[in-house]
Regions:
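Solvent-exposed loop/turn motifs of extracellular immunoglobulin-like beta-sandwich domains
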Residues: 16-25, 64-68, 74-87
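N-terminal V-set
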Residues: 25-59
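Hydrophobic beta-strand residues in large extracellular and virion-surface proteins
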Residues: 9, 24, 38, 58, ...
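Extracellular/luminal immunoglobulin-like beta-sandwich modules
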Residues: 76-79, 84-109
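Short, charged low-complexity linear segments at domain edges
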Residues: 2, 59-65
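N-terminal Sec-dependent signal peptide, specifically the hydrophobic helical h-region
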Residues: 1-12
């Protein structure tokens, strides 16, 4: 039986300022038996989060657990906003979605 997984990434936790790390998360039950990756501006950044290097000098890194996989943007800057991101799992992929200011920052009280 063939079925398609509907992928949609979310911001895992909003930040308070530029310069912090921001994680985008693509929820998948029983992750990650298939390659799980990320695209930024239609460019492949991570082919598979399980094998991607987590070198602290690299702007991005990948995470995964049984509930899904993540994309960490280190040292968030304005250049990371208003561009499209999408996740891919096996042959399924999310629709490219813009990362907007309101998605990223916690509202000040």
């Amino acid at each position: 039986m063939f079925y398609s997984v509907q992928l949609q990434w979310v911001v895992k936790e909003k930040v308070t300022a530029y310069g912090q790390n921001l994680t985008l998360f693509c929820p998948i039950e029983n992750c990650c038996s298939k390659p799980a990756g990320w695209f930024v501006r239609s460019k492949t950044i991570i082919i598979d989060v399980k094998t991607f290097s987590n070198d602290p000098k690299v702007e991005y890194h990948g995470t995964h657990n049984k509930d899904g996989f993540g994309f960490v943007i280190r040292n968030l800057s304005e250049a990371d906003l208003n561009v499209t991101y999408h996740c891919i799992y096996g042959f399924d992929q999310s629709t490219p979605k813009y990362l907007l200011h309101g998605d990223v920052f916690r509202e000040s009280k």
